[in-house]
């Protein structure tokens, strides 16, 4: 595992032990498997406060048709509910909470973690396309005034397993993807070229353009 965004003077008492990482990440991977079995991108997340899970989630993007329902956002909503029900100060609770997730949080989720002042994140594999903890942007540790506080990451726990689950998902046919359509107006009668746009997933995912020449 690799430490990212280390601040030795900040919240070292929250540094999870190896046994804690093993225990909580095992449960996060169980959530990721559940996501995969339900046709979602296999990401699972737990939020642990005083050795208690106060929020957990898996991706629910396809189920809810809402591109923001990432595992971390689902778990954060549960944390807010947990605090309200117990009349706890959410800010104080979040400052004592560790987040465990199977894939590096995206830029959106990393920004939410900053705003809520989550001090520690443990994650599995990197998110090379959307990662907010160093892979694309370093939302976790960059100096960003008025955006909450930076947080420390421990990266790489069971990373290969997390990657394999992602590969399994993307090899499957996405039932929510629109059917490929031929753009008739793009046919050039002179060279017979037709352009086909194929949507591989929801609108927030990649659009691949395939050019076919006769």
Swiss-Prot record:
Reactions performed catalytically: adenosine(34) in tRNA + H2O + H(+) = inosine(34) in tRNA + NH4(+)
Identify the enzyme class.
Answer: hydrolase
**What are the required cofactors?**
Zn(2+)
Report the record's Gene Ontology biological process terms.
tRNA wobble adenosine to inosine editing
Q: List the disulfide bonds.
A: none
Query: So which domain of life are we looking at?
Result: Eukaryota
Matches recorded under Gene3D superfamilies: Cytidine Deaminase, domain 2 (3.40.140.10)
Write one Gene Ontology MF term: tRNA-specific adenosine-34 deaminase activity
Q: Per the record's keyword annotation, is Zinc included, yes or no?
A: yes
InterPro entries in alphabetical order = APOBEC/CMP_deaminase_Zn-bd, CMP_dCMP_dom, Cytidine_deaminase-like, tRNA_aden_deaminase
- Binding annotation for Zn(2+): 70, 106, 109
Name the Enzyme Commission number(s) assigned to this protein. Answer: 3.5.4.33
Keywords for this protein: Hydrolase, Metal-binding, tRNA processing, Zinc
Q: Where is the CMP/dCMP-type deaminase domain?
A: 19-144
CDD domains referenced in this protein's UniProt entry, alphabetically: nucleoside_deaminase
Catalytic site residues? 72
What does this gene product do? Probably participates in deamination of adenosine-34 to inosine in many tRNAs.
* HAMAP family from the UniProt entry: tRNA_aden_deaminase
The family this protein is said to belong to: Belongs to the cytidine and deoxycytidylate deaminase family. ADAT2 subfamily.
* Name of this chain's protein: tRNA-specific adenosine deaminase 2
